Regions:
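A short, structured surface patch at a secondary-structure boundary
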Residues: 328-390, 429-433
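Juxtamembrane loop-helix boundary motifs flanking transmembrane segments in multi-pass membrane proteins
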Residues: 2, 6, 44, 71-75, ...
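N-terminal hydrophobic signal-anchor/signal peptide
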Residues: 1-23, 27, 130-274, 444-463
Length: 463
């Protein structure tokens, strides 16, 4: 097993190095073939170390963005996700590099070579990802897993793992009724890993320690207490480890820094986005003559209510019956214009005003309507944990989940953010939010047959 992991890491390192060298090679091509000769006209001469520095800066920035967006995660992400990550990384890096060369030149430079380079990089990236993934899958086929489960239906977890057949293959399922000895014997049969699903905490811990002692890989879905403990602070006061879970999610310093970032970024983005907001407002008004903005009561930190602002994407009489409901798949209430602005998130731009006013933050759990929260709280009281921090324009659950992710799973994702908060995490999530704008599944509506708030999920935390 250890040899497999070592080989996998070495292969990914080799594949990543080939991809990085090729991308830097494209940049070196336009640098030496076009931009450096132009600079020489102005008697600006670089020696060997200068050229190395130019290429090194490009390499470091490209690596940082590729690592952030997942552009080097061959075998971990789906090929299309890796390619999309490469696209975002290259756009960010090439825009920054363009202005870097413009500063060296002293004014704006001819951008066509950058466009040619970008086209070449994207073509190479697509070919590189295809063959890299092909080689990776040939050497490292999907892991064969054993699923151990409790009384609850395993249909949901099987569906989740089936969505990644390229990585996982659940070949056998055993229930707890088989008995501990039978489970221990089965786990010893050389599976690529064991999945623990819907198992009482005491039994889960016993299985976990057994697998850990025998170096068996474990996949488990954390419960809410697990997420809280994972984010706790470790103290070294005595001769035994102590974990501290603070009474407030963010410290005073963290709240001040977070608020300063919100004010500065919202002002900058309001200026940049104002032309798009004006055009959107005009189009909505011309379409049906209804109001441009849509106000809705939502809840933020401590359950405090505020009026969230959005560009209207539904018919004026979308909730004429007075019943609060989430958007469903293929919802007939959404207008054609609304469908587009929801897909590219333009409908969310007015919330920059909410952020500037201090009602929301850029990053945090998405604010829910009081009526929806009341429904969730009846079946899952822990849903109130999300209000320990200010609501956000985007959050952990939006980056790593979907619109129709169950409230229980959203809660675990939001708690992961709350318990792991840092300024760097906020910046990282802001950058990752750009990526999900082009991920269709993140804007899916809720399936009418989907069970959204499951009391059974919350009850499992108490077992």
């Amino acid at each position: 097993m250890k040899d497999r992991e070592t080989g996998k890491r070495l292969l990914i390192l080799l594949i990543s190095a080939i991809g990085m060298l090729a991308m830097v090679g494209f940049y070196a091509w336009i640098w030496f073939g076009f931009y450096y000769p132009k600079i020489l006209i102005y008697d600006i001469k670089l020696y060997f170390n200068g050229h190395i520095l130019i290429l090194l800066i490009y390499t470091v920035i490209l690596f940082l963005f590729s690592n952030l967006y997942g552009g080097l995660k061959i075998g971990y992400l789906k090929p299309m996700e890796v390619f999309l990550s490469q696209v975002f990384s290259l756009i960010c890096v090439n825009v920054m590099s363009y202005f870097q060369l413009a500063l060296i030149h002293g004014n704006l430079i001819w951008p066509v070579p950058f466009f040619r380079m970008m086209a070449g990089q994207l073509v190479f990236s697509a070919v590189w990802i295809y063959f890299a993934n092909l080689i990776y899958r040939r050497i490292f086929p999907p892991r064969k897993l054993l699923l151990i489960h409790g009384d609850r239906s395993i249909e949901d977890i099987l569906h989740k793992f089936a969505s990644r057949k390229d990585k996982y293959n659940i070949v056998k399922c055993l229930g707890l009724e088989e008995g501990a000895e039978a489970l221990f014997d089965e786990m010893e049969k050389g599976y690529g890993g064991v999945v623990l699903w819907d198992i009482p905490t005491a039994v889960r811990n016993k299985l976990l320690k057994y697998c850990y002692s025998r170096s068996i890989r474990i996949y488990l879905m954390p419960k809410i207490p697990d997420v809280i403990i994972k984010g706790s602070e470790q103290l070294h006061l005595f001769d035994t480890p102590i974990l501290l879970t603070r009474e407030s999610a963010l410290t005073v310093e963290q709240r001040i820094i977070k608020r300063c970032i919100d004010i500065v970024c919202s002002l900058i983005l309001l200026v940049i986005a104002s032309p798009f907001m004006l055009v959107t407002a005009i189009i909505i008004k011309l379409y049906d003559g209804g109001p441009v903005l849509y106000k809705q009561i939502r809840c933020t930190r401590g359950g405090k209510e505020f009026a969230i602002l959005k560009f209207r994407s539904m018919r004026v009489d979308a909730e004429k019956d007075g019943v609060a409901r989430l958007a469903a798949k293929n919802d007939s209430r959404i207008t054609p214009i609304g469908r587009f602005i929801r897909a590219v998130r333009i409908d969310e731009l007015p919330q920059l005003i909410n952020i500037l006013k201090g009602e929301m933050s850029f990053i945090g759990p998405r604010p829910e309507r009081p009526e929806i929260i009341a429904q969730y709280l009846e079946e899952m009281p822990e849903f109130a944990f999300r209000t320990k921090v200010k609501a956000g324009l985007a959050g952990y659950a939006q980056v790593y989940g979907k619109y129709n992710t169950t409230p229980y799973d959203k809660l675990k994702l939001d708690l992961t953010y709350i318990e792991s908060y840092s300024v760097w995490l906020d910046i990282k999530l802001m950058l990752l939010t750009l990526k999900i704008l082009f991920r269709p599944e993140s804007t899916e509506g809720v399936d009418e047959k989907q069970i959204t708030a499951m009391k059974q999920d919350a009850q499992e935390d108490d077992e």
